[in-house]
């Protein structure tokens, strides 16, 4: 097939992306994983191992190196862990949970002579306490017994507002196509748009739905269903969200759904929302083993969890900042799932309306700050490095 700038960007990727396997394919002239239509060679698609990187090869080039925390920080961390253990009544994790944690830690690159480079804790002790959590998000607090998931159906429901003045909606789809093989169930797209004849008022100029679908065809992003919605600048994703949920409605205990939206489409191409989006795709989709493990223990999981906002009726006042999250279908659709606040932030607030904080797990950057600020990303760099090194 012909090479072009779009495919080159998809393959090579930037810091925090997971395109190395595709970059190797690019250099060898085999792009079968993205668009296998070369009439001469027609190379087969890459095999997907959903237990490792969710259909995208783990990236060996992301993140920096990680050093053991200072003695002071290790003492501080140990003191905090001890205080938490005592406050929890010194409850230990179940035998099966401890074994699973220790098995993960045994081969982890962060394991340095029995201590975790990520947090500085002694692994043997850390894995005992039920409320401890891996600093790299590979195992989580054991609040309740796990509900095993077997051969899960993995759905994707996705919202895009294709703002015309920048390429960020394409950038998001470029991220998604690299990981689409993770989704073995439904892949459902909602497109919010402004009709061509619109004018005046709070209008966000967009490209038309047919152009979005054409771009998806160009890069090989396949959908099982799609629908266009006239954009409402006061409600945003809230307009399409009930329909998206309806398309995956099921109480199958082995069915899981990922919701996301094209992030940063109203901002410039070099805004902090670009790295925010890339980090969310990476964390939520590139280590399926960790995500499944979290979903076996919690009803909903995501990244950049924050507390204290969205004081609407019935909301438990927590959310995944950035609005990327996985949920168990049986946990959602066995409840009243279609009450979405008719406010612009309704979809971001929805998890906190559905579930208490203890029913959720954070895959990365718990208690996150304001991610629109570059200073917050500077603070997060060590967490990024820890997450990446743990998956090398």
Pin down the residues of each PLM region:
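Short amphipathic alpha-helical segments that mediate assembly, nucleic-acid/protein binding
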Residues: 3-4, 20, 71, 78, ...
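Membrane-proximal basic amphipathic "stem/tether" segments
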Residues: 6-13, 67-83, 151, 373-392
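Interfaces that engage single-stranded nucleic acids at replication/repair/recombination sites
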Residues: 11, 24, 125, 145-150
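Short, flexible helical or helix-coil boundary motifs
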Residues: 27-31, 82, 86-89, 180, ...
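Short, hydrophobic/amphipathic alpha-helical patches that form generic packing surfaces
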Residues: 22, 118-125, 242, 349-353
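Cysteine-centered metal-binding/redox modules
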Residues: 46-147
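ER/Golgi luminal nucleotide-sugar-dependent glycosyltransferases, focusing on the catalytic module
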Residues: 143-392
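Charge-rich, low-complexity intrinsically disordered regions
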Residues: 1-7, 11-47
